[in-house]
Amino acid sequence: NSLRGGLWLERGRRSVTRDWHRLLDTRIGMNYDHRPYWVQFKDAYELDEVMYYVEDVARIGAFAARIGVKQFFVDQRRDERINGQQHVRSDSESDPLFSAGLTWATPVEGMEVFAGFSENFAAIPSGVLGETDPVVLSRVKPETADNIELGLRVSRWPLTASATLYDIRFDNRIVYVPASFVDGIDYLGETDGVYENYGGVHSRGLETALGYGWDNGWRLSGAHTYNKSTYLGSGDAKRDEALEIVEGAQVFGIPKHTLVLSADWQGEAWNFGLSGRYLGERYLDASNSEKIDAVTLFNAHVGVDLVDISPRLKGMAVDLTVNNLTDKRYLSGVDGGGSAFIGAPRAVSVALTVDF
């Protein structure tokens, strides 16, 4: 049995400024007057964070148990240096956050069963302080999440395998909403909207992985993820509809199925690898009205230890990597507004590694 604890202290100071400068002569170039003709805003941000944790680990025969608790205290401030010299402050204090885990080393060599639970907390982002009226901000709560997992893993040469069931509930999601959605007195002035807590996300799924190696240097591996992430509503049907959030709809940009397969070979001097990644269909928006097709991409790499060429090159290696091997045209990230970003074309890179 072992008991340990710790304390995390963080102190941050930063400033954000936007100023405008006159271009001297656009016919010649982009040279500009270094003295701004207008400073739009100049804000100072301060952060003071304290986190403590206590954890106890006990081992009884084939079982190992862990239980812990931690708590966050986050004090953030934003001060305007010009304009209205507004002062905004946010004190985020989490509840005591509990976590627990249990593992069982089964009678089968290399096989282990595990389970875990954890509570998580995310303080209000500092950017929210600059976008939300102080009165409205006082009603914003930190985001929270509860994680549960249950799984099995095997590590016994030449086989490695794992399967994990998970359930994650994410609450108090902070989103930007139009000013017309704000209840009560309009404190916004000229602001178009504010940040508020709005529903959440419920994710559950299964992650599996399998790998097998041979003594001749070859190894095959694969991993599959089934992920069902759906939106939780706010409890106000009209607000949900106005924000185009459908309770139970799949989170945009998140595929239900992801599959990765790879083959790698490691010799005395040379190494080689080829991998393929399948991304399932993804929705473009929170209402799931449009989606983009699934895509499969391939990557490859080859490397050599230069000591095989000359003993004087000991500790040096060269690696060639090709991403998007077939130069596939595809859509990658999704912005949630019905648009997607164009994926990167074929990219070739060479890296030299030197060990001293």
Language-model segments: which ranges?
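Short loop/turn motifs that connect adjacent beta-strands in outer-membrane beta-barrel proteins
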Residues: 1-2, 61-62, 106-111, 158, ...
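Signature of Gram-negative outer-membrane beta-barrel scaffolds
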Residues: 2-110
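Surface-exposed loop/turn segments flanking beta-strands in extracellular/periplasmic regions
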Residues: 14-40, 89, 133-139, 177-193, ...
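Membrane-embedded beta-barrel scaffold of Gram-negative outer-membrane proteins
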Residues: 15, 105-120, 141-213, 220, ...
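Outer-membrane beta-barrel translocator domains and adjoining extracellular loop/strand segments
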Residues: 16-23, 77-84, 125-133, 173-180, ...
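Gram-negative outer-membrane beta-barrel transporters
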Residues: 59-64, 74, 167-169, 190-286, ...
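Outer-membrane beta-barrel "beta-signal"
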Residues: 344-356
